[in-house]
């Protein structure tokens, strides 16, 4: 089955209807899951005919892929446009990341992708490339501004895991509802921890260190 979200050649499609379809798909699939959510339900939610959906998206799988890409749009990268020093931008980025992934729809999206891992294996890769991989690359870039660039990729991976920590697992598993203050504490602890690692700081570890308030 093709997963291309491109319309058939020769058709001029209304971008407003495409946006409405994606919003309808978001509501249906986040409520019912990818397997149980139907195209009929998406059409009703979006206020369009089912044939209109298929003019924009060749299949249900193509619609699911387009929705995942849209929901992984890198809004978390907003702090990069700030004029703050790199350490503060890094902290802001991690706070934005935590707030984003802890949102109800983000948690539902992650659960839905895991649930479909066997049936739609490409979905996990799409999610990874559209979201987590980009975030880690930007964290590595920020870290490298003041630290050893060679360690930046592994530091970025560890910072994400430490910043989200057990609080995110509780959200995904439905065993708790940690608030933003929990994530903020985890983030500050994570930043303090990596700053204590001389190798992560690189050859200039004995010199002035970046100032991050913990």
PLM features per residue range, with description:
Residues 88, 104-108, 121-147, 153-157, ...:
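Amphipathic alpha-helical packing segments from all-alpha helical-bundle domains
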Residues 51:
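Key DNA-contact positions within bacterial/archaeal DNA-binding proteins
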Residues 144-191, 202-205, 209-214:
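Hydrophobic/aromatic-rich alpha-helical bundle segments in the mid-to-C-terminal region
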Residues 1-16, 198-214:
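N-terminal intrinsically disordered/low-complexity leader segments
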Residues 95-102, 110-119, 190-194:
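Helix-loop "lid/cap" segments that line or gate small-molecule binding pockets
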Residues 1-48, 56, 61-62:
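Basic, helix-initiating cap at the start of DNA-binding domains
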Residues 59, 116-121, 165:
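Short loop-to-helix capping motifs
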Residues 31, 65-94, 99-101:
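Amphipathic alpha-helical linker/stalk segments
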